[in-house]
Amino acid sequence: GYRSDYSLASPVILPMHHLVTLVSLGICSELKVRVRLSDGLIGEEILDANSENDDITVEFKQGDGTHITVVFDFKRDVRIVRALILGEPERGQNQYQVLCFVSRLDHHEIIPTEFMARLRQKNPHLVRTAEEKRGVEHLHMDMAVNVSHAGHLYTLIHNLCKEAHEGFYTRTADTKHWLDKGIETIEFEPLPQTVDVSGLQRCPSTLDLWQPCFCSYHLRLEWLPCLLKYCRSRRGAAGRANPYKCGIRSCSKGYRFDYYVPHKQLCPWDEET
């Protein structure tokens, strides 16, 4: 069960013999979790909680060498998904391509930073399987962003997405939300869509490499601490059992990003299976 594998480190002072299981409760706290990836290979997720910035970063490498970075930024209500995809030069592709998808954060997706920073793992060598397999979140990214004319990009997005020259996307509804809330996120200059996209096919159904189409990019996070678990303490003086936070529930979650590309050959990863 979860209680034998994970605990929330208490900020109280403990006797010295307990401290071997604690990482210092400083600004940054890192957790490495071994997971089974969707292709069956064993991978390692690195989860990094930054209490000062109030964000959590999850990084892992897929079996094909793609490097995935997902940032959950609670302060700005932003989720950034970045994929660094290795190309196949023998097929005329670049050495690598960067995709960046910036959308509004769902606060029920992952536990808050303060609890993530206190999470400890007792058996780091074990391969983890999430307790709950959540479905796929389907995001239609209807706004492409011109990186070189993006105005003010706050540092985190700039650092992650500056190489996503032909693959930086967001959603109109999300930019409106950030604007309405006065959140300093991004000043976007959307790329013009010169084609009526209503009748476009998906890229796998498009035969001509130079035709525009809708591309999809899929990924799954195999292990996320998605909920806090509560236990009942012993009854106090008033005879009441008070609940306290004693661990986490883990989830896996999929994402599918759909977006317009002017040429099918800009979408080599979306093939019919």
Language-model regions: role of each:
Residues 76, 88-92, 97, 118-123, ...:
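Generic alpha-helical propensity signal that fires on short helical segments
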Residues 140-273:
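A eukaryote-biased signal for long
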Residues 1, 6-66:
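Signal-peptide-cleavage-adjacent N-terminal segments of secreted and extracellular proteins
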Residues 96-148:
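A eukaryotic "domain-to-IDR transition" signal
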Residues 3-7, 18-19, 74, 107-110, ...:
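Short linear motifs in intrinsically disordered/low-complexity regions
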Residues 14, 127, 193-195:
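A generic alpha-helix propensity feature with a strong bias for hydrophobic helices
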Residues 80-81, 123-126, 184:
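Short, surface-exposed linear patches
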Residues 58-118:
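An acidic-aromatic
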